[in-house]
Regions:
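Bacterial N-terminal signal peptides that target proteins for export
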Residues: 2-21
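Compositionally biased, low-complexity segments
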Residues: 6-7, 26, 94
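Short, Lys/Arg-rich cytosolic juxtamembrane segment immediately N-terminal
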Residues: 13, 17, 478-483, 508-510
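Bacterial N-terminal signal peptides
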Residues: 20-30
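N-terminal pro-sequences and low-complexity stem/linker regions of secreted or lumenal proteins
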Residues: 37-480, 486, 490-494, 516-519
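C-terminal membrane-anchoring or membrane-association module
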Residues: 496-519
Length: 519
């Protein structure tokens, strides 16, 4: 533990008179953050967790732990028999076979449906065998641009939800794991998709409110809103506490597009995404406290992140959200996402603030891909599926695998412990009551990251990696044969039309020459 005590006190403790008051005062001193110098004196050196002056949360999309690290040495990966063959499988209702996890070298994957009801079905009361059943459902996706097999899954081939990748496919991600910290029991905050994960990342709750701007009418909700138009979030998010405590922050967003749905689709048509657009990956513009605090300008384009990292002007807290192209959200390419993440991390490592930075890299949900570890049940919302996650920092232990049960809530908890003296997003203490059923950061199942750091070690040097490393990934995708055929047919039609037009033009010119009278 960090030695940081949350400021929330029980009613019993407050009845113990003078002794309790004294204890509370001592506790308050213990959570007051880094020591400050007397006027005219040099500032004392930061110690422990407070050596981290910059927290960066990089959130990628839709991959399970077993899909990316199921064969990583020493991790709780895909169970295997003595001969090395996977000993687990998922029933395929179409072929009636039980499909084992297999090495998938395709750069483009399709994944499976990944909303709340699909999480329940995939988990299947802890049996973890519903992945192919969900991927095979005729309504498992909505027919939109970008999903060649949508609504008409070919019974001759299996969806790729049982596929996994190894270190030859994603070498940079495995390099970060082997040089820093890999967390092999990190669970998404809720058994749902992207919307709830991003909501919990900034506010530790996802809810829908029957009356706009009235937090008392809000109730926990896992499905994403059917429409993002006119949505408002009146409960407290983490930026409110940071604003009140003068802790700098920015939410960096990549301009482009994001999927316009998540619950019933493997992939969806894109919707525009930018600094001012509301979306499942950019939730803060919806929060009323962000508007009231005048902090909408802190939601910025990712280009500002690169500039700040190079100049040494990063805020205390940075969230970095991708666009569709670089997100790794199927059907986007894995290699493109890896290049994007590597560029973010390289830029920080080359900058002047690397020695005081902690980067938390994670994927927001499982994307319908297989994972063999059943998540713990902590409240009505979660936890959700296991996802890849890493800690990258000069104070991160080298090559350490953290087997502790964790959830993505732990990032908020770390920020609160480092910069807010342990204060939680708690209606009892933050001055903005809301009816959230639990204060997530106080749940013991959330865990903490104290095992992942060694603040007594000499700061680790940067690990600058190639942006486009050699990989064994191939550019064709599982189930993409139909796409290839369609492309070929379209190409033939286009070429044929061009040739026909040329032939017609030639004949017309010849006819015109014949009809011209001679003089």
């Amino acid at each position: 533990m960090w030695g940081v005590t949350p400021t929330r006190l029980s009613s019993a403790a407050m009845k113990r008179g003078v002794i309790a008051a004294f204890a509370a005062a001592v506790a308050a001193l213990s959570v007051s953050g880094p020591a400050t110098a007397e006027p005219g004196q040099p500032a004392p050196a930061s110690t422990g967790i407070h050596k981290i002056q910059h927290v960066i949360v990089i959130m990628q999309e839709n991959r399970s732990f077993d899909e990316y690290f199921g064969t990583y040495p020493g991790a709780d990966g895909i169970p295997r028999a003595a001969n090395g063959v996977p000993s687990v499988c998922s029933p395929d209702p179409t072929t009636h076979a039980c499909v084992k996890p297999y090495h998938n070298t395709h750069d483009q994957n399709l994944g499976g449906p990944h909303g709340p009801k699909h999480a329940v079905a995939d988990i299947d009361s802890g049996k973890m065998d519903g992945f192919l059943t969900e991927a095979r459902r005729p309504a498992a996706c909505i027919k939109k641009t970008g999903n060649p097999d949508c609504a008409t899954v070919d019974s001759s081939k299996s969806p790729d939800v049982m596929g996994y990748h190894n270190g030859s496919d994603i070498p940079n991600y495995w390099a970060y794991a082997s040089n820093f910290v890999l967390q092999d029991h990190m669970f998404e905050a809720t058994a749902a998709g992207s919307w709830t994960s991003h909501m919990y990342t900034v506010s530790e709750w996802a809810a829908k409110c029957s009356t706009p701007n009235d937090a008392s009418t809000c109730k926990t909700s896992l499905p994403a809103p059917k429409s993002m138009n006119g949505v408002e979030y009146p409960w407290t998010d983490l930026t409110y506490l940071m604003h009140k405590n003068q802790v700098s922050w920015n939410y960096y967003i990549s301009k482009g597009s994001e999927p316009d749905c998540e619950d019933d689709a493997q992939t969806c048509g894109p919707r525009p995404q930018g600094v001012t657009t509301y979306g499942i990956w950019n939730p803060l513009p919806y929060f009323d406290d962000v508007k009231q605090d005048g902090d909408l300008t802190k939601i910025q384009d990712v280009s500002n992140f690169y500039q700040a990292a190079r100049a040494g002007t990063l805020p205390k807290v940075s969230w970095v959200a991708p666009n569709q192209t670089v997100s790794e959200h199927p059907p986007s390419l894995i290699s493109t996402g890896q290049t994007y993440v590597t560029n973010l991390i390289n830029t920080v490592m080359k900058g002047p603030e690397w020695n005081s930075t902690a980067i938390f890299l994670a994927w927001d949900d499982w994307g319908g891909f297989y994972d063999h570890v059943a998540p713990p049940k902590v409240d009505q919302g979660g936890f959700g599926m296991r996802v890849p996650a890493m800690v990258i920092s000069p104070y991160a232990k080298r090559g350490f695998i953290d087997h502790s049960p964790l959830s993505l809530d732990v990032y908020t908890k770390f920020i609160e412990d480092d910069f807010l003296g342990g204060q939680r997003l708690d209606p009892a203490t933050d001055g903005r009551p809301d009816p959230r059923p639990t204060v997530r950061e106080t749940l013991p199942q959330v865990g903490d990251l104290s095992a992942d750091f060694d603040f007594n070690q000499t700061p680790r040097p940067p690990l600058v990696l190639p942006l486009r490393p050699h990989t064994d990934l191939t550019k064709s995708s599982t189930g993409s044969s139909s796409t290839g055929v369609i492309v070929i047919v379209i190409a033939i039609i286009v070429v044929g039309a061009v040739l026909a037009f040329v032939a017609f033009s030639v004949r017309r010119r010849r006819r015109a020459k014949v009809l011209v009278p001679s003089h």
